[in-house]
Amino acid sequence: FIVALVTGILLLIWYSPSVNGAYDSVLAMQQSPYLVELLRSLHRYSSDVCILFIILHAFQMLGARKFGGARWVAWLSGMLLLGLVWMDGWTGYWLVWDERARQIALGTANFLDVLPFFPEPLLRSFLTNDGLNSLFFFIVFFIHMLIPMGVVAFLWIHIMRLNAARFFTSVRMGLALLGVLIITSLMFPATLAAPADMTVVPQDLQIDWLFMMPLWFTERLSGSVLWVALFFTTVALWGIPWWLTKGNPEPAVVNEASCNGCTQCVQDCPFNAIDMIDLEEPRSGITEFARVNLDKCVGCGVCVGSCDSSSINQSTIPVMDVRKFVSQLEEDVRHVAFICAESAGERFPIDENGSCEALPGYRVVPVSCVGWVHMLTIERALRRGAEGVLVAGCGVDPACRSGADYTGSRLAGDREPWLRVDHVDPS
């Protein structure tokens, strides 16, 4: 997105936003010094990569089922981002005003003519070359310039509920992507079709399927059918957080009377779902307490593993009950395993006694996220006779973002609350 934005701004130096001058200005770019042609190719390919990554990210979230509960805001804003980026690419191809732009203009007019906003059908403006409206062309140019502002706004909405959200990839990955884009642009420069002629139907037109796939529909369906298809597609995509969610985990609850206001849960919550509230009557030096925002909480339980005072709980898996459960080991069961319910715990059947055929000799506790596991729970199991404790979390795509990393840091003594090595044998 950044590459497309920067190159697009630079291309304004050479581009003429008028129906009569657009094609000639783009043709001049293609025939001008090497740098300008490279900028145009970078603009085109970076746009393709941008929408491709958005689509892949959407499928990743869909496959990982990261769309239910409080995540619905991220899902809907993500769908809007996808639509905005596609629209920016659609209008961008229009601004070239070649044969591909001709088909885009006719398809758009076919789609918009259903609306009762226009005094006369838009298609009439594209019957002849003389009927082309320069003002309408400039409006398309203005929309193309305005959409990136909407992308930035919805991107903020998309990630505003994430704690320590990352806007950019690593420097190494960013440079690698830029290098690939530059090499691709040099080897396969962006093409330019023949100039748009409203009286001639282009033959064997090569299109960019990532942005121009709707042309297949606009050339075959009426505007009314297109609107109906768009409506049901939008409802289907936007309804995924409610239609495909099996059930949302119970949110965390804070016992405000015992909260000591340490703020560790606020620092650890992956989804910014905890706020510190001022006490009306401070007690023993404590001036604030934690409160879970139920509209943001996804029920990951990472805050439970952060709370030294055991003031945060989930009704489905109370901390004290689990500590008692792992303390009462049988003679043939001398190990304890905390398994993420979103990964291994979902695949292995575990009975109410904590027995699992895949882990003989272990008392298995499925948890919403391994970040739920407080170090005191591990210490208690080891002090009460457990010969070892296994903590198995998610793989490369954690269901609850940083929960597994936090647990690893706590076990290593790099993050509070850490495992007290003087109380147990960490080996």
Where are these regions (language model features)?
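Iron-sulfur-associated redox domains of electron-transfer enzymes in respiratory
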Residues: 79, 93, 104-107, 318-427
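Membrane-interfacial segments at transmembrane helix termini in multi-pass membrane proteins
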Residues: 247-257, 313-325
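Iron-sulfur cluster-binding cysteine motifs and their immediate structural context
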Residues: 264-323
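Conserved oxyanion/phosphate-binding beta-strand-loop segments in alpha/beta enzyme cores
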Residues: 2-22, 338-353
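Individual alpha-helical transmembrane segments in multi-pass integral membrane proteins
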Residues: 44-49
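Membrane-embedded alpha-helical bundles of multi-pass integral membrane proteins
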Residues: 1-13, 24-43, 56-251, 266
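Short Cys/His-rich Zn2+-coordinating modules
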Residues: 240-253, 278-280, 284-290
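Membrane-cytosol interface motif
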Residues: 251-270
